[in-house]
Design a protein with these regions (language model features):
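Solvent-exposed soluble domains appended to multi-pass membrane proteins
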Residues: 1-214
């Protein structure tokens, strides 16, 4: 990742090996530790305009964080789960790590937003379809990855509710959101503002009306 990141003209690359922390796993450090180091960096560069890509890993196996100690209300959640979902320890632990990842990111956003109110956040995931307890759902719910643009000047009606896109459109969309009149940029795909056609991955395609499989057996 480091070699690729620096080849894309980023000025710096930091990984778990640069931080001091306890716990974590082969994927990296716990999310809350990662975010604290990013907070520190942003605070030190408060007068600079900086662009950060942050890769979190705590909602990834082996799920070895003590999420109950972090505040995950396991017993309360267990009582509220529908019959269609399992309530075994493995499932609850997996849910707890999703909760932990969400809490860590939410706390980070609140802190940075308070210190730098003009910050624009983009939140997305690299894939879906990996959570064992969420298979009894429709294809869209199971497969679609959300992408959230959040900031004080981001209008909730900026994009249509049924808008679809792909990760390759994030940078071009950001360029149009933060750029000045007359700015130009190069991109493989147009922004989410300019394209309303079909998007696809290795097994699915979708438009604003439907999602279908590319594989017919």
């Amino acid at each position: 990742i480091k070699q690729f990141t620096l080849s894309q003209n980023f000025d710096e690359f930091h990984c778990a090996g640069d931080f001091q922390y306890e716990g974590g796993n082969s994927w990296g450090c716990p999310d809350e530790i990662l975010f604290k180091y990013v907070e520190k960096y942003i605070a030190e560069e408060k007068d600079e305009r900086t662009f950060h890509i942050i890769l979190t890993t705590s909602n990834h196996p082996p799920y070895n964080i003590d999420v109950v100690a972090k505040g995950f209300p396991k017993e309360e959640i267990k009582q509220k789960l529908p019959d269609s979902l399992g309530s075994d320890e493995e499932t609850l632990n997996e849910m707890g790590h999703i909760w932990y990842a969400d809490q860590s990111m939410g706390n980070f956003i609140e802190k940075v937003e308070a210190d730098k109110p003009d910050t624009l956040f983009v939140i997305t995931g690299d894939h879906a379809e990996r959570f064992d307890f969420s298979k009894e759902v429709d294809l869209k719910t199971l497969s679609v990855v959300p992408c959230i643009f959040y900031g004080k000047n981001v209008d909730k009606d900026l994009l249509a509710d049924n808008k679809v896109g792909c990760h390759l459109q994030i940078i071009s969309t950001l360029a149009e959101m933060v750029g000045q009149k007359g700015d130009t940029y190069s991109s493989i795909w147009p922004s989410l503002f300019d394209y309303n056609g079909i998007v696809f991955n290795h097994r699915l395609w979708t438009d604003t009306e439907k999602i279908l499989s590319l594989i017919h057996i």
